[in-house]
Amino acid sequence: MAAEKLRDLSQPIDVGVLDATVAAFFVTGSKEERAAADQILRDLQANPDMWLQVVHILQNTNSLDTKFFALQVLEGVIKYRWNALPVEQRDGMKNYISEVIVQLSSNEASFRSERLYVNKLNVILVQIVKHDWPAKWTSFIPDLVAAAKTSETICENCMAILKLLSEEVFDFSRGEMTQQKIKELKQSLNSEFKLIHELCLYVLSASQRQDLIRATLSALHAYLSWIPLGYIFESTLLETLLKFFPVPAYRNLTIQCLTEVAALNFGDFYNVQYVKMYTIFIGQLRIILPPSTKIPEAYSSGSGEEQAFIQNLALFFTSFFKFHIRVLESTPEVVSLLLAGLEYLINISYVDDTEVFKVCLDYWNSLVLELFDAHHNSDNPAVSASLMGLQPFLPGMVDGLGSQVMQRRQLYSHPMSKLRGLMINRMAKPEEVLIVEDENGNIVRETMKDNDVLVQYKIMRETLIYLSHLDHDDTEKQMLRKLNKQLSGEEWAWNNLNTLCWAIGSISGSMAEDQENRFLVMVIRDLLNLCEITKGKDNKAVIASNIMYVVGQYPRFLRAHWKFLKTVVNKLFEFMHETHPGVQDMACDTFLKIVQKCKRKFVIVQVGENEPFVSELLTGLATTVQDLEPHQIHSFYESVGNMIQAESDPQKRDEYLQRLMALPNQKWAEIIGQARHSVEFLKDQVVIRTVLNILQTNTSAATSLGTYFLSQISLIFLDMLNVYRMYSELVSTNITEGGPYASKTSFVKLLRSVKRETLKLIETFLDKAEDQPHIGKQFVPPMMESVLGDYARNVPDARESEVLSLFATIINKYKATMLDDVPHIFEAVFQCTLEMITKNFEDYPEHRLKFFSLLRAIATFCFPALIKLSSPQLKLVMDSIIWAFRHTERNIAETGLNLLLEMLKNFQQSEFCNQFYRSYFMQIEQEIFAVLTDTFHKPGFKLHVLVLQQLFCLPESGALTEPLWDATTVPYPYPDNVAFVREYTIKLLSSSFPNMTAAEVTQFVNGLYESRNDPSGFKNNIRDFLVQSKEFSAQDNKDLYAEEAAAQRERERQRMLSIPGLIAPNEIQDEMVDS
């Protein structure tokens, strides 16, 4: 094949053959030709000398694809090897690229026809600039500006280069350059911006060329967020921009520039200019888009440019208000313009576009939070009274600060009232609502959660809660007014009722209790009434879903009103017979949610009742659940289990449990009775399904009853183990006789489902039961043979991973009391599971995760058992841990790393410290650096850092009393372990990262030692190293900052807990006292 000769780079490459190879890959080739071309092109890219051919290729090809290929090779060299190249080679390449750019952009025809090529050359030039400027190319900016003045097309391209440069340095630099380099480039751009500024103003005042003006506005946009402020406010720049705003061709670019200026925030120094800018802007906007315009309709029928204008307008207003609303509200002559701007923004918020709405919603959320905080935090009795729902303010209570807060609230009262209307009209769907309208207008059960909608609901809910706190009465009035219009039919529509009820449910907990009670009595009464008077299955399903959602959000109200609670629960039982998709599921979910928060109410005799509700419910149990699917019945059993769990009298509790389990127990007894006559009976698929269903019902009840499930599980436990053993043997026989495909048959799958559910039931019970040793003694010994022995005997495909998680739960629960059993557990599961999971990274994913969870439980609570392992066994454990954290599946890698940390800490404190670390220290360090610098393992960053910190602190901890190195293989002794580890690490990293200099590696390792006792400094050192080593370049590096983000989330949760309603009553784990 002619293309093979391309591999010989000792002479100039044959550009014709290269063109044909590139064309075969991108355009003309068959599947085989494309694969062969791909391989050759990859090999050429990987060849370190290929870049020397780039100029030759660019000069001799007319193929754009070939040019791009050559520039791709060059880009790799610039990114990773530029500083290592000889000066003359660097300068030669730099000059060549600059000349080609000037040549192609100096005349209109070539600039337009070669636009894509010029753009790519610009990117290459900027990559070079990032390395060489300012130190090695001091004249770069003056050269660029001088070139721009020679022709309008060159000037247009120079603007494109300047834009790219700003974006590269300021927008895309995190994770690609060290903090020091970014700082240096920013300072250089700042100091030389005068030339760029003059060039931009000159073009905007003198040029008539549309493309050039657009390129200039676009470049300016990239610089406005960070340049010295004098260039904006002490020159004619703002006036010039505002002059371009009314011109349709420049409107969108200009408003983007004005938005950047609006988003600057640096104190009060330029307030006058901001007020002037806003005043002129609103004046021009009223002509372009008159206030009477129906913006949502205009948007839906507008062109792409017009829609972009509305989007940009939203960004401008939200940015300006975010930083300068205080200036506008404190300047009396522009207050009316501020309100006009807010009116525009509210109208834009009704636009049917998710992105536009997100922009508006984020701002509304921050504005109402700010108004609420001022109102919440001023230590003013009037304000506090208002927060408790005591309105209006009492005369004489308002001091100076309170007065300001009140005036501000007064100023915004009208826009805030309109904003409440917006939030109620556009409220997003909460997670609990399962009934939705599909694209054909049918009411169906939701099949997939939409995460974007859930995020939007969370922000809207929070916003509406702040709005409710600012004026409870207006919130209540607007909601009841809209509900009346639903009843009268004036505004009846599924969507209107949905958004209204979602809004009502979302403000739960934000009103004072007496106001909430009054409000809800009306809401629930009206919704139940609406359900009665409305005809049509779909309509009823929509109303039912809304009733269920609203009542599920207000447990405090239900606990205080037994009659309403009983009515609501009976209504849910009614809905459990309604077969419309989603209604039964939602009824069962809502029932569970209500019972969890009101359980005590169901086990006491209420006024006017003859017996507790739970007893009445158990009498009619069979009728209530007769139309439910098995999974819904399981949910129902969990709910009733919650009620029974609230009964404090043990005798009554056992009686209720007996009545609850009567139906499944009766069926179980029949099946076991038949099996005693003939074991074949248990092989019938209908029987197997019934057994599975009975076990699932038991698991559901055990989930909510915990310890109190003891009498029930004791009743079925031994029979259940016998069924388990028998089904297990059946599975093994089928797989042994039928080969690997047997495990895919429905019969084997069904048998295994029973085995898994048995294990899940035992695990659920032991996990939920209070820590009572006698329970462990009763249940664990019988399982040693039935479950563990069975696992060991089975063929790999028949082993249940749940065995591993069950024993992990048992060890986590009973801790050191399990010490004597660990050798048996090891014997049964260790070797045979390792053989299953160490052949590759894919097979048996469930076994992997659960195996390492079991090992972690043993390492944490039964560590002495690990010390007793033989050296080969311990080596297997350590190899398996390394195997785990090398895994790209996040859960497995994290479990492995957590387990490793437990091992490191425990061995450090044990008598085997020297022996363990001499065997494994270097291997662990090497493996951790390997995953740390692999971008697939970014999520493990926090744990990688903790392991390295543990290793670097060890040599000086006093735990080691012998050298880590092997004296027989190391030619000279080190003064101490610290010196050895330092040198070993430097050697390890130098050989792994040849692109880093010895000085850089040594500096990094010294930094690790200096910061080893400072977790934050240690972590930052490693972050900088990852950037410097080029392992984590232009990618999303948020995983490296995950810990900081988690701390921020916890602070936010604490803040939310302090504001009534912000965390929904259902989400607060407070065991809601409801006696």
From Swiss-Prot:
Its main location: nucleus. It is found in: Nucleus, Nuclear pore complex; Nucleus membrane. HEAT repeats lie at residues 91-130, 135-171, 232-267, 336-373, 388-425, 474-513, 563-600, 612-649, 682-719, 756-793, 798-835, 894-934. It is a peripheral membrane protein. Gene3D superfamilies: Leucine-rich Repeat Variant (1.25.10.10). GO terms for biological process: embryo sac development; mRNA transport; pollen development; pollen germination; pollen tube growth; protein export from nucleus; response to heat. Residues 37-103 form the Importin N-terminal domain. GO terms for molecular function: nuclear export signal receptor activity; small GTPase binding. InterPro entries: ARM-like, ARM-type_fold, CRM1_repeat, Exp1_repeat_2, Exportin-1/Importin-b-like, Importin-beta_N, XPO1/5, XPO1_C_dom. The keyword Membrane applies. Signal peptide: none annotated. PROSITE patterns: IMPORTIN_B_NT (PS50166). Interacts with RAN1. Belongs to the exportin family. This is Protein EXPORTIN 1A. The lineage of its organism: Eukaryota, Viridiplantae, Streptophyta, Embryophyta, Tracheophyta.
